[in-house]
């Protein structure tokens, strides 16, 4: 079994994955980053940690964050983002289709970077988001 904490997939292997598969992994990576950030910097009551996490991981917030990141992405990252954004999925009632597609793009980007072993870039992009949050 591969070391799931230190992945380094090739670009080809990442590009063979489905867009929604990348978003599925990216959703978990993004939420873990948010939870870690809040535990290290925020109010430590469980109620507040949960409330603050929800405010960062919902589709509306992710859509806003995605738009803030777009100018900072290189071509490859933009392609991963577009793959997720253009994936066919159904938006929940709590988000508009546009918000949901932007959020899915952000998650696909984070999933691809994680699978590529680009934790340095994940940290850089996540830091940009939290500086503006």
Question: Can you annotate each of these PLM segments?
Answer:
Residues 1-133:
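Double-stranded RNA-binding/processing signature
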